[in-house]
Amino acid sequence: MSFKPLHDRIAIKPIEQEEKTKGGIIIPDTVKEKPMQGEIVAVGNGIRNEKGEIHPLELKVGDKVLYGKWAGTEIEIKGTKLIVMKESDVFGIIN
């Protein structure tokens, strides 16, 4: 992928919900919830403080994170769906 977010933004590849329930019922797209977790695939350089110094982000590529259902902006690059959001929109890292 050749996408690099700017400043304190990150790009996340959402982890999609299962297509079937444990009981074998297929879930149609119309009732699936928006994903709220994903894997970080790109991060910006960081945020500038008042002195112009760049503070790097805490999150890094490969982190699995939990974020708000409506956070960020959905984009598509070379057929891959991503969500771009600020680091502060992430609730936490999933271990």
UniProtKB/Swiss-Prot annotation:
CDD domains: cpn10. One of its GO terms (molecular function) is protein-folding chaperone binding. It is found in: Cytoplasm. GO terms for cellular component: cytoplasm. Its main location: cytoplasm. PROSITE patterns: CHAPERONINS_CPN10 (PS00681). One of its GO terms (biological process) is chaperone cofactor-dependent protein refolding. Keywords: Chaperone, Cytoplasm. Pfam families: Cpn10. SMART domains: Cpn10. SUPFAM superfamilies: GroES-like. Belongs to the GroES chaperonin family. Together with the chaperonin GroEL, plays an essential role in assisting protein folding. The GroEL-GroES system forms a nano-cage that allows encapsulation of the non-native substrate proteins and provides a physical environment optimized to promote and accelerate protein folding. GroES binds to the apical surface of the GroEL ring, thereby capping the opening of the GroEL channel. PANTHER family: 10 KDA HEAT SHOCK PROTEIN, 20 KDA CHAPERONIN, CHLOROPLASTIC. Heptamer of 7 subunits arranged in a ring. Interacts with the chaperonin GroEL. This is Co-chaperonin GroES. It comes from Rickettsia conorii (strain ATCC VR-613 / Malish 7). The gene is groES.
